[in-house]
C-alpha cells in the first residue's frame, strides 16, 4: 500500500477529517470548504504521529538529500518538526507568522546561520501563503530553503501557483484527491458527497457563494 493511501486512511480513522457540505468551514483565507482536515489531532495518536514523522524524514532524505536544519511553522508544524529533527539528528527551529512584539522580537526561534540548508515542515498546505511567509523569513535570515515537506495538501491551483512562482519545492505524504477516494471506498462519504467534494476542488474561491 502506498504512503499516500496509508496516511489518508490514518487521518480518516482518527477522525481528523470533517465533512460539512451544508455548513461549510471558512478558512483564514476566506475560502469556504465542505471539508476540513485537522492534522493537529494526530498528536493524540502515538502510532499515527510516529508513522508520519518517519515518512516525512524518509521523504526529506529522498527528495532533498542532506539538510542542515529542520524548521517547523508555528504552531501546527512545530511538533512534527521536532520529531522529524530527532529522527534525522538535526537542529530544529520554528518560525512564527510574524515577529514577536515583545522580548527579542524574534520571528525565528532557534539558531540559524547564513547558508544553512533548511527544510520547512508544515502540517497542511491550502493556499500556501503561511508556508511561504516562513520560507521568506528564513531566507531573509540567510538560510537556503530547499523546500517544504507537509503531511497533506488540498492541491489547490492557487497554492500550486504561489509555490511555483516562489520556486519552492513541495513534497507531501498525502493529498486531497487520495483522501476523498479512500473516504469513498471505505464508506466515510457517499457518492453525493463525492460530487460535492469534486465540485469544490474545481473552483474553491467561488464555491458556496
From Swiss-Prot:
Documented EC number(s): 2.4.2.10
Superkingdom to which the source organism belongs: Bacteria
A single GO BP: pyrimidine nucleobase biosynthetic process
The protein's annotated pathway: Pyrimidine metabolism; UMP biosynthesis via de novo pathway; UMP from orotate: step 1/2
Pfam families: Pribosyltran
Catalytic activities: orotidine 5'-phosphate + diphosphate = orotate + 5-phospho-alpha-D-ribose 1-diphosphate
Enzyme type, top EC level: transferase
GO molecular function: magnesium ion binding; orotate phosphoribosyltransferase activity
Cofactor needs: Mg(2+)
Gene3D superfamilies: 3.40.50.2020
Binding positions (orotate): 126
Annotated positions binding 5-phospho-alpha-D-ribose 1-diphosphate: 96, 100, 102, 122-130
Keyword annotations of the record: Glycosyltransferase, Magnesium, Pyrimidine biosynthesis, Transferase
Coiled-coil residue windows: none
Physiological role: Catalyzes the transfer of a ribosyl phosphate group from 5-phosphoribose 1-diphosphate to orotate, leading to the formation of orotidine monophosphate (OMP).
Subunit details: Homodimer.
Family the UniProt entry places it in: Belongs to the purine/pyrimidine phosphoribosyltransferase family. PyrE subfamily.
Name of this chain's protein: Orotate phosphoribosyltransferase
Species of origin: Listeria monocytogenes serotype 4b (strain F2365)
Gene name linked to the record: pyrE
Amino acid at each position: 500500500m502506498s504512503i499516500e493511501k496509508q496516511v489518508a486512511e490514518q487521518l480518516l480513522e482518527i477522525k481528523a477529517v470533517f465533512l460539512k457540505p451544508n455548513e461549510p468551514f471558512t478558512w483564514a483565507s476566506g475560502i469556504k470548504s465542505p471539508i476540513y482536515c485537522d492534522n493537529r489531532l494526530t498528536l493524540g495518536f502515538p502510532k499515527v504521529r510516529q508513522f508520519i514523522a518517519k515518512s516525512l524524514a524518509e521523504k526529506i532524505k529522498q527528495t532533498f538529500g542532506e539538510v542542515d536544519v529542520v524548521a517547523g511553522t508555528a504552531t501546527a508544524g512545530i511538533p512534527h518538526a521536532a520529531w522529524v529533527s530527532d529522527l534525522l539528528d538535526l537542529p530544529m527551529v520554528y518560525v512564527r507568522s510574524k515577529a514577536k512584539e515583545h522580548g527579542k522580537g524574534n520571528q525565528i526561534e532557534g539558531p540559524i546561520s547564513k547558508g544553512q540548508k533548511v527544510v520547512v515542515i508544515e502540517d497542511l498546505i491550502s493556499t500556501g501563503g503561511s508556508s511561504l511567509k516562513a520560507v521568506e523569513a528564513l531566507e531573509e535570515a540567510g538560510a537556503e530553503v530547499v523546500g517544504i515537506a507537509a503531511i497533506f495538501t488540498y492541491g489547490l491551483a492557487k497554492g500550486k501557483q504561489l509555490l511555483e512562482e516562489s520556486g519552492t519545492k513541495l513534497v507531501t505524504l498525502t493529498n486531497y484527491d487520495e483522501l476523498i477516494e479512500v473516504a469513498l471506498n471505505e464508506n466515510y462519504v457517499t457518492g453525493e458527497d463525492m460530487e460535492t467534494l469534486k465540485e469544490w476542488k474545481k473552483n474553491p474561491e467561488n464555491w458556496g457563494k
